[in-house]
């Protein structure tokens, strides 16, 4: 089985350790991994801001970059959702590119979805002793319907005590450009999320979308909260070394 890594902008620029963790996870699963260098932003910020033509250019570049990939795996439910839902929407009136968009979507998977449902991994052997909560991101849980897969993998990490996060389905307030355009509302939303996290007395927040982790983690640091923030890939990879 050959897998291509769709690294995403946030991992490339702000969370390189997440990309490294995905490589470790794929190696542990015995998967042959490559990295198409032609990949770029999925186009979601442009699309959500109304710049349709710019988003199409990004989408076409992504389609070309992964044209020959057997499977495409990304550590982001948000970017996977963009490929699955909005590429097809953008190219509805263009039969050639619509077909290519469908072909790309059919091969693109969020990381935990791929590990659980394609690789069938039900015996993840790792160890990390922490009290944690898991944040369900909007795009991953609502748009892709992926809710149980990350929790299933985390439940297999020895020593990891996952507490139930109150109102876990509530948005953290990031929403890409929403956090910039509606900053005061976004700030209120992330403060509410942090209150719910603190109520569990967890010392670790785990998530599967780096936008959410950047938003919540940034607020935690500004408020001097002693709560660590990790991507699910980092947790699974950390455990492999214990």
UniProtKB/Swiss-Prot annotation:
Molecular function (Gene Ontology), one example: oxidoreductase activity
GO cellular component annotations of the record: cytosol
Pfam family for this entry, one: CCG
GO biological process, one term: lactate metabolic process
Chain's role: Is involved in L-lactate degradation and allows cells to grow with lactate as the sole carbon source.
Family membership: Belongs to the LutA/YkgE family.
Name assigned to this protein: Lactate utilization protein A 2
Gene designation per UniProt: lutA2
